[in-house]
Amino acid sequence: MNVVILNGPNLDRLGKRQPEIYGSTTLADVELELFRLAGQLGVDVECKQSNYEGELIDWIHCAADAGNPVIINPGGLTHTSVALRDALAEISDGPGFIEVHISNIHAREEFRHHSYLSPIATGVIAGLGTIGYELALRYVVSTLNS
């Protein structure tokens, strides 16, 4: 099984940008831990990050065509992108996707409280830091193996 893990705009800045909110862990650290965990769980993960909405959508289309589940931290696109939601709807109708946020978006500015993606997500993990990615991967593997 292959699980696609996508990170949206500004997540390449983890460990540098607003560490008081997002912590000091880098995206490379997160990906390294996900590769390690995937090996333990017997799955392959494909980690990608882009600051460009269209590139994320292209990757979602590839995941849909391959029948792969997606774990996504859409960053700020969470609150603005109908196009991303439309692409993820195809994943939602198939293997499903988990929406992950490092910070608790509901405890932050009002404009961050709304997600265009949450209503069609299999699940949402927010506010648990970078361990949220690991929890999402464990969930995806457990549901696909059952």
Swiss-Prot record:
Keywords: Amino-acid biosynthesis, Aromatic amino acid biosynthesis, Lyase. The active site is at 22 (proton acceptor), 101 (proton donor). The keyword Amino-acid biosynthesis applies. One of its GO terms (biological process) is amino acid biosynthetic process. It comes from the Bacteria. One of its GO terms (molecular function) is 3-dehydroquinate dehydratase activity. Substrate binds at residues 73, 79, 86, 102-103, 112. InterPro entries: DHquinase_II (IPR001874), DHquinase_II_CS (IPR018509), DHquinase_II_sf (IPR036441). Its EC number is 4.2.1.10. Gene3D superfamilies: Dehydroquinase, class II. Signal peptide: none annotated. The keyword Phosphoprotein does not apply. PANTHER family: CATABOLIC 3-DEHYDROQUINASE. Belongs to the type-II 3-dehydroquinase family. Catalyzes a trans-dehydration via an enolate intermediate. Homododecamer. This is 3-dehydroquinate dehydratase. The gene is aroQ.
